[in-house]
């Protein structure tokens, strides 16, 4: 089921939650609405579901104006962050709830619920109550309940936000596999950029009720359209052209790459910076001020005294070990990766 969001606006009092939003969601795709709290993501999700009404604009579902559609007739499954399971019902009864409202036969309900329990890998827990389940299990039950009515669209509002990191990672992979099996048009709201990158076919970046950028995860990361998008997706070094280091860094790029000198700042990712123990004409001395091990890479805060500038640098453990530093007081030398992409510059 395709969804067209046509010039949607919404205010709550004086707060502009959504400001002329236009977005097309293809049938069978999985889209992440990414942005900070209060940026309008959940408001848009509720408008699509029919839980809220826009002040302006139209939602089109499969080419039809959904303005007059009831919540039930939209055939949309909705999963909230807090699961919204019925505490006094068993897992089985929670999943069966929507089917019973549709007056489906007992045998068909039993068959479908058992099939869904197997799908979410909880086939032996149908007799338990929500309080007897872990957070990850409760979220899978909430998803099973949403899928029971065979929705054409699945809406997920921060579905993994209340779970610990390991469970979130496992559920992200599980959700992606689930989507590949059923190809239900899915919209997930998240403020977690890693979650959006792992799950979505496309990411829609929200900021203050507006869309900043729409694109595939890798395109959003490699070619951010605005400083906000660049900063939202990972660490960034923001460097002013007023600092002499700008000329040094920009001179590292091939001449064929354009430089828009009227712009006042440019942005560069920490992994685009190289550090070494060897001095040469294309690098400058620096010192490490802080080090943080983060899984399979190391985050360094370095200070380049010649330019009075602090930089964030990301290197692999092997690259760091090759430096053979005895202390942080030793000089290191900074340059750019020769095959790295041009830093993205913005007018501000």
UniProtKB/Swiss-Prot annotation:
| Entry's Gene Ontology molecular function annotations | ABC-type sulfate transporter activity; ABC-type thiosulfate transporter activity; ATP binding; ATP hydrolysis activity
Which Gene3D superfamilies is this protein grouped with?
P-loop containing nucleotide triphosphate hydrolases
EC numbers on record: 7.3.2.3
Q: List, for all copies, the residue spans of the domain called ABC transporter.
A: 3-233
Q: Catalysed reaction per UniProt?
A: sulfate(out) + ATP + H2O = sulfate(in) + ADP + phosphate + H(+); thiosulfate(out) + ATP + H2O = thiosulfate(in) + ADP + phosphate + H(+)
Question: What SMART domains would the database entry show?
Answer: AAA (SM00382)
- Keyword Nucleotidyltransferase belongs to the record: no
Q: Where does ATP bind?
A: 35-42
Q: Its GO CC terms? A: ATP-binding cassette (ABC) transporter complex; chloroplast
Annotated function: Part of the ABC transporter complex involved in sulfate/thiosulfate import. Responsible for energy coupling to the transport system.
Family, as annotated: Belongs to the ABC transporter superfamily. Sulfate/tungstate importer (TC 3.A.1.6) family.
| Annotated protein name in UniProt | Sulfate/thiosulfate import ATP-binding protein CysA
